[in-house]
From Swiss-Prot:
Gene that produces this protein: abd1
Residues bound to mRNA: N203, N204
Alphabetized GO MF terms: mRNA 5'-cap (guanine-N7-)-methyltransferase activity; RNA binding
Protein name: mRNA cap guanine-N(7) methyltransferase
Basic and acidic residues compositional bias, start-end: 48-76, 141-152, 408-420
Chief place where the protein resides: nucleus
SUPFAM superfamilies membership: S-adenosyl-L-methionine-dependent methyltransferases
InterPro entries: mRNA_G-N7_MeTrfase_dom (IPR004971), mRNA_G-N7_MeTrfase_euk (IPR016899), RG7MT1 (IPR039753), SAM-dependent_MTases_sf (IPR029063)
Compartments reported by the entry: Nucleus
Organism classification: Eukaryota, Fungi, Dikarya, Ascomycota, Pezizomycotina
Compositionally biased spans, kind Polar residues: 1-10
Enzyme Commission identifier(s): 2.1.1.56
Binding site for S-adenosyl-L-methionine: K207, G250, D274, D312, M355, F356, A357, Y360
GO cellular component: nucleus
UniProt keyword annotation of RNA-binding present: yes
Amino acid sequence: MENRSSSGTPRPSAGSPDAAKRPSETSPAAGRIPAGQNGSSGDKKRKVTEEGEASEKSEPPADRPMSKRKRMEERHQKLRKRGRTPPSAYSRRDAEAAPVPNRNRDDPANRSLSPLPHRSPTPEEQPRQRKRPGGGARMGLVDRETLRRRQEERERALVEEAMRTSQGRGVTDVVRQHYNAVPQRGREWRKTESKIKGLRSFNNWIKSTLIQKFSPDEEFLARLNDGRDWADDSGPPPAEEKRLLVVDLGCGKGGDLGKWQLAPQPVELYVGLDPAEVSIVQARERYNSMKSGRGNRGRRNPLFHGEFAPKDCFGEWLGDIGIVQQVGIDPNAGPGGSVMSSRWGGGGFDVVASMFAIHYAFESEEKARQMLRNVAGCLKKGGRFLGVCPNSDIISARVVELNAKRKAREEQEKKEKSDEAPEDGEVEEDTKLEWGNSIYRVQFPGKTPEDGIFRPPFGWKYSYFMEEAVEEVPEYVVPWEAFRALTEDYNLELQYRKPFLGIWGDEKDDRELGPLSERMGVRDRNTGELLMTEEEKEAANFYHAFCFYKV
């Protein structure tokens, strides 16, 4: 039997080998003290027990179990010595799934014991083809060629669009700079010193005739011309009954302000627009002079309210001008608008005028359509579009005539030089056409159609010169039939078209316009003769006038 101390710790017996090896710990005789000298026997037992506990703390017995923490530390140390990383707390979560061996279903050992027929593998189990980088872009030569052609077409379209935009800005800037540079001359100079005073007066009379005949609305004209059309036989309407709202595209220096003040149906609002900023300033100054009473010359109608703004009327939308927005402009005018808008919609203006200006819009189809969209958008139903522009019939006749003469001359030269070889460096004959006289000149820089039909109808540029007025400014042919067909897309119906000299023949004896021509210095009061030279008549015949109705 083992002897136990008071603390319950087992103690080896006297005959065990441990007792022989450590006599100081187990033998009572090794540290025995005589009784009665240093305390009682209980004190001796307590002292021996405390010494045994101290020795047990310093050296644990070999058979005492090791703690779990210490075992883990020793294990980690061994793994580090072998070059392996000990597992972390996340080793189970992050451990990769063990690869599942590819089982051969044909092997009888791997075959399922189910009596049901074997099911085909699901799409997820089928092997997937690997996609190589850029594999979708690899295609045949035909597809690559198609893509290349499309890319080239897109790039070419972008370049052409950029060129058209830059060229459009260039022509507009040239025209703007030219009219900004034209000096302001007074009325006295135009009547006495001008070389083309007869042509100036005649052109002003033509514009006055157009305003007198076509600016009033149908109701006003019916009451003015024939009171019997009305049940009450009231005669001409009073001036305050209905007044006109007018917008002038290309108003210049305001030379037509007086003509609009003399309109049969009084004007309530006049909006003048022009791309030349200097011209707008001068037009505003002329209007302020008329408003203050200077140069009014006793006109019967009160002066209308006038608004002026610089604007490219053919290359830009007019809807961002404040006064135009207030009066009203239809953004749906034209072929892209809705059916209801074209039938019931419209702007708020009674008249849109454009004198000697619309030929600048025929640089391109885009500009021509933008011009007509502005016109149709401003006009109310029944409104009028008045204007004058170069006569394409005159231009075509001249082109056919000059091309025929050039062709005959070339054939004659070929017959004369049929045996002669062309010399080195010989330049081909210039194909440009030119005609005019001392006061005006028209010149086409390149080839022109021999039959006089301009196809396509846009972009046929020529240079025009007019003494004291226009200095070699680029203009564009307005092929009339193409223009008339284009206006139908904007609900504009042609009502009137006449060359300048034809208007004179029709209206010179009118009871109102005849005396007006005498007051304006167009006709001699005594002889009735037209006060223009033959060269001025030729220059005047280059133009014609027109009027469209908004339907």
